[in-house]
Amino acid sequence: METMNHICKLAGKCRVAGQEGHCSVFCTPFILLHGVEGKTGLWGNMNVPKKYRNCDLSNLPIKASNPVAYAWVSKYVNNVLENVQEGVGLFLYSIPNADNRFGTGTGKTTAAISIANEFMIARVIEASKGGRPIVENPVLFYKASELQTLYNSRFAGTFDMKEAADKKYYKIKKLLMNVELLVMDDIGIRQKITDSFENELTEIIDARDNKMLASIFTSNLPIEKLADTMGDRIASRISGMTEQIAFKGKDNRRGGIL
């Protein structure tokens, strides 16, 4: 029978990885993480874009360009279960410069997803060893712009389209409010959000803050400028529930790295 170590994200931490009779599609942790066919499971439902699914601390390409940020990420990952359980949040933001006026492509999203991936692996291992059971997917990645687009879609199109969008939005909103670790990417990239969407986002962030759930936010804006697009309430709450970590340097997306 074919072994699953070539696709299983647990392989690097599993003592029976690659061993016939043990490392197979019938492995319970494998099924939990990757699904029966190895294509879904918890790993496939994190909503992480395909290009980032293999990101982790070992291949995080910011060590030279952002050593302080790398040290923060490393410290978080090295104690990731406890950090998430204690609700330790992060705000990863860019410092623009002459060569990168908008602070894009500095590794914020890659770093945030690396933490999310590392946590998912650690969480599955914990549950597989008899620790806290996993009832719902413990990790969710969502772009702020996609959430706003989904929110707005509830008011456009036919009745059936609006009804479908409404159901999808509230399903996602519930996940955002309750998932163990949330990565919300690129907040503050649009012009000033509407009061109604600000209220929705505030409700989500408040719920997470009150439950002490860990949240990682990425932005091209420092926290003091976030209020210009997201409002004072959201900026204040994010500031109070996260450690702020600066990223600098050139736009590495031009070279296909990030």
For each feature predicted by the language model, list its residue ranges:
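Residue-level preference for the first positions of well-ordered beta-strands
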Residues: 87-91, 138-139, 181, 216
